[in-house]
Amino acid sequence: MIFRSKAPLRLGFAGGGTDVSPYSDEYGGYVLNATVDMYAYCTIEVTNDNRVCFYAADREEIFEGNSLEEFELDGNLDLHKGIYNRVVKQFNHGRPLSFRMTTYSDAPAGSGLGSSSTMVVAILKGFVEWLNLPLGEYDVAHLAYEIERIDVGLSGGKQDQYAATFGGFNFIEFYKEDKVIVNPLRIKNWIINELENSMILYYTGVSRESAKIIDEQTKNTKEKNSRSLEAMHELKADALIMKEAILKGDLKTFAEYLGKSWEAKKRMASSISNSYLDKIYEVAIETGAYAGKVSGAGGGGFMMFIVDPTKKITVSRELNKMGGHTMNFHFVKHGTQGWRV
């Protein structure tokens, strides 16, 4: 038997960082994001040789071993192992499974599109299909969060898991005790078309480790760093304004607050921007972009810009001279999907 699954990556428009503890526990967080037609993919081929093989095709990393109740997390494909460990323990009565798994993603790790969390969701969805697990969207997203953040111990927020699971444009609220509310936004097609037409997605060519940035941000929150906290309060307020703007099709306000959000985000942690990203931003604005920001924790990965559609090619041409490259994309309405072959 073969089971396949995929989960969409997301663009973070506003509020990113307010979904990270301890901020979300103490103040509550708001995030506005949308999924795009770039995915994390998983294939599970069921075997009967009492072996497990994880193959991350895009990273050319492989792990093979005898089927065990639990694999040690030693730095080699820990996310894959962490998911396996949890699934075996929680849903298979501790009985080892035998299979070969292949995974890959349309975006590199460190892209700022939520690629690692989205991969966890895709792999989990594969197991849901195979083992027929009775898990709804909230269950899958929360389980993905627990595996990545608690079991495997990677720092980060919660928005990516929920975006990948639910799909579409979402306004997501985060509160203490792991309370999360996903509000799917009903955005008119003309607004989605206009936003798509007005957006440039630019890969800076620089991968980064979001965990380091998030650790600095968490430290600032715990120490009640006023500059960092005020910036996070501002990001949260901006998310509300941008939600209203996108629902009404007011892209002028949407762009204005996207730019404001980026300025606020840079105050959250010193590693969020750098001279290379600042230069890219400068070139985009000089050639006609209204505003922009980095998607995800910052430090590199993808940047997005809002431009007049008639200037899109001109701005893209200049950005492509900066060492990275623009990427075509479309927004998608569906979240993670799984099927058997």
Swiss-Prot record:
Gene3D superfamilies: 3.30.230.120. Mg(2+) binds at S116, E148. ATP binds at G110, S111, G112, L113, G114, S115, S116. The record marks R10 as: Transition state stabilizer. Its EC number is 2.7.1.168. It comes from the Bacteria. GO terms for molecular function: ATP binding; fucokinase activity; metal ion binding. Keywords: ATP-binding, Carbohydrate metabolism, Kinase, Magnesium, Metal-binding, Nucleotide-binding, Transferase. The keyword Transmembrane helix does not apply. Pfam families: GHMP_kinases_C, GHMP_kinases_N. The keyword Glycoprotein does not apply. InterPro entries: GHMP_Kinase-Related (IPR052203), GHMP_kinase_C_dom (IPR013750), GHMP_kinase_C_sf (IPR036554), GHMP_kinase_N_dom (IPR006204), HddA/FKP (IPR001174), Heptose_7-P_kinase (IPR014606), Ribosomal_Su5_D2-typ_SF (IPR020568). One of its GO terms (biological process) is S-layer organization. The active site is at D160 (proton acceptor). It catalyses: D-glycero-alpha-D-manno-heptose 7-phosphate + ATP = D-glycero-alpha-D-manno-heptose 1,7-bisphosphate + ADP + H(+). Pathway: Nucleotide-sugar biosynthesis; GDP-D-glycero-alpha-D-manno-heptose biosynthesis; GDP-D-glycero-alpha-D-manno-heptose from D-glycero-alpha-D-manno-heptose 7-phosphate: step 1/3; Cell surface structure biogenesis; S-layer biogenesis. Belongs to the GHMP kinase family. This is D-glycero-alpha-D-manno-heptose 7-phosphate kinase. The lineage of its organism: Bacteria, Bacillati, Bacillota, Bacilli, Bacillales.
